[in-house]
Amino acid sequence: MYKLVLIRHGESTWNKENRFTGWVDVDLTEQGRNEAYQAGELLREAGYTFDIAYTSVLKRAIRTLWHVQDRMDLMYLPVVHSWRLNERHYGALSGLNKAETAAKFGDDQVLVWRRSYDTPPPALEPTDERAPFNDPRYAKVPREQLPLTECLKDTVARVLPLWNESIAPAVRSGKQVLIAAHGNSLRALIKYLDGISDSDIVGLNIPNGVPLVYELDEDLKPLKHYYLGDQDAIAKAQAAVAKQGKAG
């Protein structure tokens, strides 16, 4: 049996402001830093250790990983930073308040943009300052692979090459792997691992800063998964994530 630990970054400044974030590189709030540190404490107390970690190239995930490593005394851990673990690109919605957007377009439309499998939000114009083309962190990524908007289907297609080529081989080799990423890049991976249908994925909500443990068989098929921590608090956090895209 193998174990894989996933963690969504702690609360970011735009999580707090209920804004669509996507590839915009916002930082953690004080609460987010505390959530990350507490995640490290939960993992340490439960006896976990790691051989390698994976994260995105966005600071809210990177800093979350730092705090987990710090609390676990694993600052030396090899870390792979990949744009493939970035949050889903929210296109022209990037930076907009979710509730205000729902009030304008309707709860149902915003739910489709946020949680459906194959309907992307309106795309950015290539000349928009939020477009990734001139960002140095993506200088080595072929321009045609850089998105101006994404649906979850696009995010799955982006994440899976990293899983197949790097993460899965690391797990199979016996390494203890930690992934610190984002709500939708983790939803994409979980959809693949658990075989969740396109329609059912809409109901999957991942709370900030809570370790999610997957126990996998020799074929990397899930045997079970569970969150570490107070289960009532986790359920409330998941419900709060689900409400973010509603008008009020």
Swiss-Prot record:
One of its GO terms (biological process) is glycolytic process. Pfam families: His_Phos_1. Homodimer. Substrate binds at residues 8-15, 21-22, 60, 87-90, 98, 114-115, 183-184. NCBIfam families: pgm_1, PRK14115.1. Pathway: Carbohydrate degradation; glycolysis; pyruvate from D-glyceraldehyde 3-phosphate: step 3/5. One of its GO terms (molecular function) is phosphoglycerate mutase activity. This is 2,3-bisphosphoglycerate-dependent phosphoglycerate mutase. It is an enzyme of class 5 (isomerase). Its EC number is 5.4.2.11. Belongs to the phosphoglycerate mutase family. BPG-dependent PGAM subfamily. Catalyzes the interconversion of 2-phosphoglycerate and 3-phosphoglycerate. The gene is gpmA. CDD domains: HP_PGM_like. The record marks 182 as: Transition state stabilizer. InterPro entries: His_Pase_superF_clade-1, His_PPase_superfam, PG/BPGM_mutase_AS, Phosphogly_mut1. Disulfide bonds: none annotated. PANTHER family: PHOSPHOGLYCERATE MUTASE (PTHR11931). It catalyses: (2R)-2-phosphoglycerate = (2R)-3-phosphoglycerate. The active site is at residues 9, 87. It comes from Burkholderia ambifaria (strain MC40-6). Keywords: Gluconeogenesis, Glycolysis, Isomerase.
